[in-house]
Amino acid sequence: QVLGLEVIAENYRQERDSYKLDLRLPCGSQIELFSFANPPQRTSRPEACGLRHLAFSVDDVDQVVVYLIAQKVEVEPVRVDEYTGKKFTFFSDPDQLPLEIYQG
């Protein structure tokens, strides 16, 4: 809800003791999220190698940061990409997966 995603479906998969959540983004794209009772430990720093975070393009990073803070989300200080000159920052989802917002 904080990110404005619509829940399409949420299903419990008993054989795996896990949930699958289908979400629709405002642009119409969909994301599938899975939960697992005992996932393996892994590095989840934003700059770790491999798939370790999701990034969302936004028009105004500062405006989204104000909104997230109002929703009681802890947000890292906004940084500026040294190559593009565009703003970005990170925050964490409830499972501590880093999420990024960057200036589109």
Give the residues covered by each predicted segment.
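Vicinal oxygen chelate
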Residues: 21-29, 43-104
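Core segments of cupin and vicinal oxygen chelate
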Residues: 1-29
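A short, acidic/glycine-rich surface segment
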Residues: 9-10, 16-19, 38-44, 77
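Residue-level preference for beta-strand/loop junctions
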Residues: 15-17, 48-50, 83
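Short catalytic micro-motifs in class I SAM-dependent methyltransferases
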Residues: 3, 53, 100
